[in-house]
């Protein structure tokens, strides 16, 4: 699969499509001292069965949404893994469909999360939103896939396995947790997540594509 992607034009071909449609900054500098535009503008797709042109998508609505708000400028949510149980608990209020609010519990990195997630003193319940910050490309060198958070053990025993997870880092692509990831700007450079505190109320609205601390 990786070789097919490379032979079809690879990342430069994808970025060229984004540049052509105004979806990425062409003047952003890269590691080779040239801009993204200089590196990728004009690159061609060699195999449209592997890389589809922007105007010929395989699917008009993909399994992701881009959110913004006062917590971050942009972040990605993988909506294709939202289970019926999760949708029923969070997204089925007829007076406020596709939106939910909850109390934030904030972890400064995966080490703190692993140390504290099962601590009853955090008072995590089924409506809590779990946050992990300091895990972006600058705050956590290597940008490892560490924003994988489960519910505390006492909720799992009650059959509640997934809570909303939000972070400025990455997560394994095999994770089934409904998560908002790659929040930018990240906390390490002064993004909104740096100001968030446990106990703050946060609202997520998938219709408006917003994530805001209240």
Please describe what each predicted stretch is.
Residues 1-187, 191-214:
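Catalytic or ion-coupling anion/metal-binding cores of large enzyme and transporter domains
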